Amino acid sequence: MSDPLIKRALVSVSDKTGIVDFCRELVSLGVEIFSTGGTLKTLQDAGLKAASISTITGFPEIMDGRVKTLHPKIHGGLLAVRNNPDHSAQAIENGISFIDMVVVNLYPFEATVAKPDVSFEDAIENIDIGGPSMLRSAAKNNESVTVLTDSADYAGVLAEMRAGGGATLRSTRLRLALKVFELTSRYDRAIAGYLSKSAGTEVAAAESMTVQLDKELGMRYGENPHQSAGFYRLTDADGTRSFADYFEKLHGKELSYNNMLDIAAAGGLIEEFRGEDPSVVIIKHTNPCGVAQAPTLLEAWKRAFSTDTQAPFGGIIAFNRPLDMETAKAVNAIFTEILIAPAYEEGVLDMLMKKKDRRLLVQTGALPKGGWEFKSTPFGMLVQERDSRIATRDELKVVTKRQPTEEELGDLMFAWKICKHIKSNTILYVRNRQTYGVGAGQMSRVDSSKIARWKASEVNLDLHGSVVASDAFFPFADGLLAAAEAGVTAVIQPGGSIRDNEVIEAADANNLAMVFTGMRHFKH
């Protein structure tokens, strides 16, 4: 079957970008245009010859435009198989004319429900019914019908029509049909997600769920060079989330798979200190190797770096303040993969960009606190609520005879925010709002404690007067006793062990203040 000439087009768009120029070209190619509502008015106001859809259906738009294209003369004209004699005979018998092109984009449901003050009624009115129906009919019959949902495709289709005497290529029609089904799938997922949240349905308890993944960034390879990879924006019950919603890359090489993991880790941790004193986070292999707060960003950098003077090389640095020149010069003295800041002061970017490969990012918005987390296994997908909570001071329970001092409480809360972002088992030593020793990812909590103390000793950081945080309870008193021997004065941990009393007694015996959060922060 030869490529069919496009003689009649149905045009109905919410996003009218480029539609007048596109339709003007269609008219010049001899295409008859039919349209609806606001689109028809836009075309006619531009002086284009376009007819109302009601001239096809013989039926007016009714119910505030809810019903206008749901008609056999529309869908028959789209779905008829052109080389099927029975279809052709039935079309003639019922006064149905073929429609060769559909140009439709949908009511902006996702943009509508993203508004913080959207009403349920507004959301419902932005659920498109006729649009998806026409798109699906046209896409199903892609052998004969060209369907467009994206203004980015207008120029290419026009070029093909000019070259092909008014026809498009079969490969183009198939590609455009695929875009339709990807679009309608994502659209329905957004609607289902919104209604699920409105009804109070918990996604983790649902019998089934759907997520939409759309490629946002290509990558040379994955975690290792022999693994292929890409980064995909995610649409689920909580809406659509993409890298571009929260970060902008200003300079440097393309981002790798490992870079994205580290950016997520750095962004999540620096978010804990939004609105607080100047803070610096140094990440290596998704774990913090240095974190500090200070009166100035430069001092925070110096203190964070002093926690571990080797690991930051090739690391990711995040700041909770605009990066100033003095701090930037200090950071520039070492090799770093990525810098992330809410802004860069005048002249800083010019200086940093002299290292052509280093990635410079601006964090443009606060990362979402809630939502759902997905982790794949070879045999299925795990879904859990994101670990977005952190215990407040009011929620802390002092379980020892000695109350923590105000200074100790400040360090305990600082340590607890960081501890949550370190691979389990985690033991973290903090003093004066600076990490002193990080013990991460060990199978034994005692081993994590040993590593943390060893790391502190390597850089001559004295643990006397420090506090210690543990992401889960101490199963035995030995871990706490080791911390006491190192000079710790206060402890923060979830509690919940059957041996809590033994641990509390050990703390009291060593005059330690200890608080329970009642909340564990395992991170696998």
UniProtKB/Swiss-Prot annotation:
Keywords of the record: Hydrolase, Multifunctional enzyme, Purine biosynthesis, Transferase
Catalysed transformations (reactions): (6R)-10-formyltetrahydrofolate + 5-amino-1-(5-phospho-beta-D-ribosyl)imidazole-4-carboxamide = 5-formamido-1-(5-phospho-D-ribosyl)imidazole-4-carboxamide + (6S)-5,6,7,8-tetrahydrofolate; IMP + H2O = 5-formamido-1-(5-phospho-D-ribosyl)imidazole-4-carboxamide
Highest taxon above the source species: Bacteria
PROSITE patterns (UniProt xref): MGS
UniProt-listed Enzyme Commission number(s): 2.1.2.3, 3.5.4.10
Family in the record: Belongs to the PurH family.
HAMAP family: PurH (MF_00139)
Protein name, as recorded: Bifunctional purine biosynthesis protein PurH
Gene source species: Chlorobium phaeovibrioides (strain DSM 265 / 1930) (Prosthecochloris vibrioformis (strain DSM 265))
Organism taxonomic ancestry: Bacteria, Pseudomonadati, Chlorobiota, Chlorobiia, Chlorobiales
